[in-house]
Amino acid sequence: MNCEYRQKIALYADGELGPPEQQEVSRHLATCPECSAALLELLEMKKSVRLAGSRFSAPPELRRAVQEKLRVRETSAVFWKWGFAAACCLLVAMLGVMIYSRQQRQDWVIASLVDQHVTNLASNLDHRVDVLSTDRHTVKPWFQGKLPFTFNLPEITADSPFKLIGGKVAYQGQEPGAELLYEIRKHEISVFIFRGQEGSSKLVHDRGSSFTVEHWTEGGLRFYVVTDANSEEVDQLASMLQQANR
Amino acid sequence: MDERFNKEFEQLALPLLDPLYNFACWLSGNPDEARDLVQETFVKALKAFASFQAGTNFRAWMFRILRNTFLTSRTGLERRNTSQQDEDGYDEAVVSYDTPELAIMRQADTELVQASIARLSPVFQEVLLLADIEEMKYQEVAETLAIPIGTVMSRLARARKQVREHIVDALGKKS
């Protein structure tokens, strides 16, 4: 009854045997009615189960819903991809505009300060400064009550090539600030100090108008040095001012 | 995730919609739940498609996601808790081979076979569905259910035996 091949019938019916075993079982089936009957019954059952078991097919609305879900993800992926690209472009454009407008504003400030410096040079000494003194301890206190901020002036020693002439109140963008006048070998140097943003920024050279302009931010103050003296001398004065205001 | 990625997934997965839905209906016994299972399977599979390794069995992967989704559903948990019956220690070597009942098997109508499949406990039913309806190889069934091939073989033998016994019994009573 229990033929030794019976255990292989299911493997044979399920196509799980390798070619040599498959052939071996085939040969055996030709001679064993018991195994042949078992195989036929199993194949019959497999067929019945396949037919009866394939009972449910996806309703059209499920197919639509699944396709919709795939499309939504696809659309949202495309949206995010292009949306991200567009947002990046917009950000770059905005940064460009900001940098450009900031640069424009800076250019405009420098141009107006150069104008003030030139106007000053053309004036009589009486009009160039409102406080006339080489002593920083006279000039600085003069600004008390006139400006909404305070600043320090560097000490000018006797052997220094620089000489403080005096100062007056200057305006820029309706903001009051200090305008200090220095001299180095007959060249006059205007130093403008206004309120600015907190933090500090590096020294920037600007020679766009044949005048040397150096500007930086330190301790919430904006410093502008405008002169026709050479840039090494401007650097030296700028460095003294930076040290005094640290 | 680009468009080509989605298209590739769609091409592989959409032909499996009917088989997955059929499997989900058998597992859950409820068309509404099956619909949800299938939708969740597609969403999960698409999300995880990036981690799907080319060359491995996509069909087994999809069926595994569906089955795992079912097992963590309320119905799945309930069925799992009530179906741990007399399976352990079963060995195909000790299956008794009854006299073939070809004539009786031929009399079995679709309704009776469906009832026989429905009576199976989930562990036997899922092996039978994957092997005989989806015509998966044992290896594929083993991958889908994350069980050894030996277990696939013994569960399949047992599932067939129970279906056969039920059919024989039902038809025997009728006659």
For the regions a protein language model found, what residue spans apply to each?
Chain B
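A short, charge-rich alpha-helical start-of-domain segment used by transcription regulators
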Residues: M1-N22, D32-R35, L46
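Short, aromatic/basic-enriched loop-to-helix "N-cap" motif that marks the start
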Residues: D18, A50-R64, I149
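Helix-turn-helix DNA-binding module
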Residues: A118, P122-E126, A131-T151, E165
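Structural recognition of an alpha-helix C-terminal capping motif at a helix-to-coil junction
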Residues: D36-V43, T56-N68
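Internal acidic/polar
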Residues: R80-R106, K137
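Arg/Lys-rich amphipathic alpha helix in sigma70-family domain 2
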Residues: Q53, R64-Q85, R106
